[in-house]
Amino acid sequence: MLRLNELQLAKELIRFPSVTPVDAGVMSFLEKKLKKLGFKTKILEFKEKNTKPVKNLYARLGNKRPNFCYAGHLDVVPAGNLKDWTVNPFKPSIKNGHLIGRAVSYTHLTLPTIRSV
């Protein structure tokens, strides 16, 4: 089984401007990563009348019990006017030992965090 580099994954996830309902490819990206780690995955698409479809990724590793279920999201709120930012929100950087980028404090980055614990 491959190992996951948590910081690298976090940086890669930040690069996706995944503003709902457009996932900007983040679901497919994460699905490929999880498959390489041995997960069985499935992307489901949900759509209600007069709305754009929204994707969800389900991933499972093994069949043993008890189960651990993680429910999170990979979307972000719109960044607004990029001219108002002091950095590009979708270009991760490290400043003074802190990861800087869009969704750093969101559920968006809990997967790398959970994996590292």
Task: Locate predicted features.
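Acidic/His- and Gly-rich active-site-bordering loop/insert found
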Residues: 2-104
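Conserved small/polar residues in nucleotide/adenosyl-binding loops
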Residues: 107-113
